[in-house]
Amino acid sequence: MNVLLEMAFLSQTLPDPYEDFIHHHLQYYGYFKAQKSSLPNSGTHQRVWRNSPRYMLNGSFGERDDFISDSLEKEMLLWPTCLSSTGHAHIDAVNRDSLLLSSPLLRTRQLIFDELDEASPRLREPRELFSCFSSRGPLQAPRWPIECEVIKENIHHIEWVPHQPEYFYQPTGSEKVPEIVGEEQGTVVYQLDSVPAEGTYFTSSRIGGKRGTIKELAVTLQGPDDNTLLFESRFESGNLQKAVRVGIYEYELTLRTDLYTDKHTQWFYFRVQNTRKDATYRFTIVNLLKPKSLYAVGMKPLMYSQLDATIYNIGWRREGREIKYYKNNVDDGQQPLYCLTWTTQFPHDQDTCFFAHFYPYTYTDLQCYLLSVANNPIQSQFCKLRALCRSLAGNTVYLLTITNPSRTPQEAAAKKAVVLSARVHPGESNSSWIMNGFLDFILSNSPDAQLLRDIFVFKVIPMLNPDGVIVGNYRCSLAGRDLNRHYKTVLKDSFPCIWYTKNMIKRLLEEREVLLYCDFHGHSRKNNIFLYGCHSNNRKHWLHERVFPLMLSKNAPDKFSFDSCNFKVQKCKEGTGRVVMWRMGIINSYTMESTFGGSTLGSKRDTHFTIEDLKSLGYHVCDTLLDFCDPDQTKYTQCLQELKELLQQEINKKLNNFGQDMDLEGNWSDIPLSDIESSTSGSDSSLSDGPPIRLLNIVADEPNQKTVLKNPKKKRLQTRKQRNEQYQKSYLMRELKLTENAPGRARFVSTLQKQPTFLKSPESPSPSVRRSENPRLNETQLSGREKGTSLDPPLTSPKNKERIQSKKPGFTASCSPKRSTNSSLGPAPDVKPNWSKTRYSATRKDHATMAVYPSLHIYTYP
């Protein structure tokens, strides 16, 4: 019977000559045959694509032999379990309806009717991305740079949650600090031959990486008694470059830097074989770059035993003793390096084990997960999977749109959007596990998940930097740059993942409000989970950006730390996704930082995070989103009130540190919050800013640019303190030069270094007046707070020179005061240096008064 149907199908002639040609031409390529043995669920998704509750025009059924369109009865016989009662009702309605037109002008597969009596059709959605692929393997094999050798092995790890909490290592102070001896006194047992380093740039990629035979890089064992470990890292996310044997059971390890750079060594992931059970091994990583690490306060490395996974179903676990993080004693004139050393014992002889900085989550893991979603007949109805773009290497950057179908166009347009992304930094695999937990929940059939899908449109980019994840980078893409510093880029070809993400959000903002944007990250120097946000100067939304983090801390009190959150917008963070989206109009724009270590809070105090802990945070994000948007605003109002109380306490703490006391009731909210908060301790990626490496090499090849390139680049200061000191020194030099033709300024400069505070004089002219009166005050000198920057003010500011020469010479400058936005109030009067313990005693009638502290500005009104 099937043979007869297929013969009849192949001999079918279509009325349209072009369609008839394409039909007969493509059937030999298997497109119309679609054997069900290789497409286990494709029919289900095509049925969803075709038989979504919509009325379709004649000819809109596909012309594949598993979708026979001669009669609807054949369709129902082929897929009796796929059609719901609603689907049957729609099919009957189509059969009965006289509007099923047969005109050649309306014979199309792309137009559908929302209602039977509706005269205007609409375009149908495109087919599912995975509709023609098997669930037995990933959609697309990863593409590697052509310089990278890749072993032909499938690395897979099981998920496992330890039965007991994994506590931090408690340093004893007597841990051994091995001296680094190197390959001069040791034996190299593993080394990558060709590693793309600084000075080179990405050119092309291919599946499987480098052409040719894969070399055996590990040493050859001399017999069964040879106990040398066999190292390997030429697989997804692996990054071991060299292993040197310096003792019977001691090895020095060198990590490969991010490709095409000489920086960013923190993530590690490698394999060892030929283990011995009763021996104590010591591993020392010798080229880490961060001076501070969670390894110094008890974090342990992760180990995975293949035999334990096979026999006992045990996965990744924390292992390590005698853990020490210290500075490398080798001085090669370059940037200082740091070492991590630990000892361990393997559970089995002749085992295959893996070590990692954190639980790996590879590009293949993501593709398998997304493929399972696409092949799920229920989830695929409200989760649309698309390709946002291709990365530099040609790997797909996936975009998920998750929302329940709306009953009317008006209901669909009223939905707000939520944008979530992860893995812009490839070494921060904890962000992928949080994203995995979020997707598990939002795609589930729980009532809360269904409610969220009813009221929101979720745009999810689960892996922004697939190239970096594949090759084992810690921070950069194949452009050799940190993508989270280039959200303002216009270089679409160099940073496609970021450019298309920003463009997608920009288009989304044009059609609906984006309630929340959150980019998931990992943090290597702080425990717990916390958020970085952006403080808004809009009084209407004052403190509102802090409500969501506070709610999240209440929903996950043993994981999330609100005290670690920061909302200061620093100049060095202007290119991050958080700040760029905030400036595009998304008030609730966040970076979620998840520790590589564990928690110091509540019931999980001093324990490492597991995979389940990170997944649960994804659930808590959904739960908090429901609280945040609850029509009953009781929780929201309570959080706002609590935030005001916390802010008052922080201000009082600042004042106490200055040795002052003050009643702030009624006026404390005028204090700029950016002056209260300290700067974030996020990673410094300034060395990874700038144009892509490829463009720099193109410029270097130009003959007329040689003279420019000979000038050495100005050496960057390593710490913020040094930058501030240099800025203050250069500023003082400019002040001294300004006094040459202005003797009246000499007294100002002489008092500059005496006292740290000054008062605003009522006679001080506005900045625009001063600019016209004194042309020497140029735009550079009048920059700072008046231009909206959030950096801490310098020691003094040129716009305060005239104010210094007040009637009270004891007061000198330390920072520029914040101008009041209330233009109806008069200028602030002079203030005496004696402070009242209750209310500010210098407040005069009919005048606004401002007391100025270093980095703290307070307004009081009568």
Swiss-Prot record:
Protease recorded as keyword: yes
EC category name: hydrolase
Biased composition (Low complexity): 674-689
Disordered as annotated region, ranges: 669-692, 704-728, 750-836
Cofactor binding description: Binds 1 zinc ion per subunit.
SUPFAM superfamilies: Zn-dependent exopeptidases (SSF53187)
Cellular-component GO terms for this entry: centriole; ciliary basal body; cytosol
Designated name of the protein: Cytosolic carboxypeptidase 2
Quaternary structure note: Interacts with RARRES1, KIF11 and MAPRE1.
Ranges of Basic residues composition bias in the record: 711-721
Record field: catalytic activity: (L-glutamyl)(n+1)-gamma-L-glutamyl-L-glutamyl-[protein] + H2O = (L-glutamyl)(n)-gamma-L-glutamyl-L-glutamyl-[protein] + L-glutamate
Lineage of producing organism: Eukaryota, Metazoa, Chordata, Craniata, Vertebrata
Activity control note: Inhibited by RARRES1.
Alphabetized InterPro entries for the sequence: Cytosolic_carboxypeptidase, Pepdidase_M14_N, Peptidase_M14
Tissue distribution of the protein: Widely expressed. Expressed in tissues with motile cilia such as testis, lung and trachea. Also detected in brain, eye, muscle, pancreas, intestine, stomach, pituitary, spleen, adrenal and kidney. Expressed in mitral and granular cells in brain.
Localization in the cell: Cytoplasm, Cytosol; Cytoplasm, Cytoskeleton, Microtubule organizing center, Centrosome, Centriole; Cytoplasm, Cytoskeleton, Cilium basal body
Induction record: Up-regulated during ciliogenesis.
Keyword terms of this UniProt record: Carboxypeptidase, Cell projection, Cytoplasm, Cytoskeleton, Hydrolase, Metal-binding, Metalloprotease, Protease, Zinc
GO molecular function: metallocarboxypeptidase activity; zinc ion binding
Composition bias type Polar residues, residue spans: 813-825
Domain Peptidase M14: 359-629
